Amino acid sequence: MATKEELREALNDYMTRGQANERVRRTMKDWNCLMHIQATDVDAAFTVDIKGGALRPVEDGLRDTPDLIVRGSSEDLANIFWGDENPASNYMQGAIQTQGSQEDIMRLDAMALFIFLDK
């Protein structure tokens, strides 16, 4: 089980790698999405705001009504954010759940894949 602090650190690192990745920036260039990241086993929830493809700093807690929600155990989420596990396989196995429009989910999948492959 990852702590809230470990999950926050992993998420910050993930967002930094995403912003530095050219393929991610191209994929997200016109994407606006308010995303909630929620751990199901510890009290850890974060808001990620993407405006015009730019990843804003991660915020503690949940803000406003999200376009996309990502839920999973703290360990599964941290392993994905650190790049230790393939996000697609975790999603297919049901370890991670997403809720939102198909377009937002597909963009998140593309972003996760590009970051994972670039590690």
Model-identified regions with their sequence ranges:
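Feature captures hydrophobic
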Residues: 1-119
